[in-house]
């Protein structure tokens, strides 16, 4: 049964591969691709900058840093007190 189903699928895939790329999928010229690289890099940089700024602002406005700082302070105080009592 599995072989019966896989043979038609294999034939369809083989036909698609042998057909080659469609005209719209054909590779563009190298010169036009090279001309677009600086624009693409600038766009990528701007997008990355915007996302980074948004992430930093979201972290600044959340209360996670304050909670983390308080937790570390409390834990440090507890450890410090335990060491004082243990070595006194």
Curated annotation (Swiss-Prot):
Q: Where in the cell is it found?
A: Secreted
Gene Ontology molecular function: fatty acid binding; phospholipase inhibitor activity
Which region is the signal sequence? 1-26
Predominant place of localization: secreted
* Keywords linked to the UniProt accession: Lipid transport, Secreted, Signal, Transport, VLDL
Q: A Gene Ontology CC term for this entry?
A: very-low-density lipoprotein particle
- GO biological process: one example: lipoprotein metabolic process
Family to which this protein belongs:
Belongs to the apolipoprotein C1 family.
Entry function: Inhibitor of lipoprotein binding to the low density lipoprotein (LDL) receptor, LDL receptor-related protein, and very low density lipoprotein (VLDL) receptor. Associates with high density lipoproteins (HDL) and the triacylglycerol-rich lipoproteins in the plasma and makes up about 10% of the protein of the VLDL and 2% of that of HDL. Appears to interfere directly with fatty acid uptake and is also the major plasma inhibitor of cholesteryl ester transfer protein (CETP). Binds free fatty acids and reduces their intracellular esterification.
Stated name of the protein: Apolipoprotein C-I
Ranked from the top, the taxonomy reads:
Eukaryota, Metazoa, Chordata, Craniata, Vertebrata
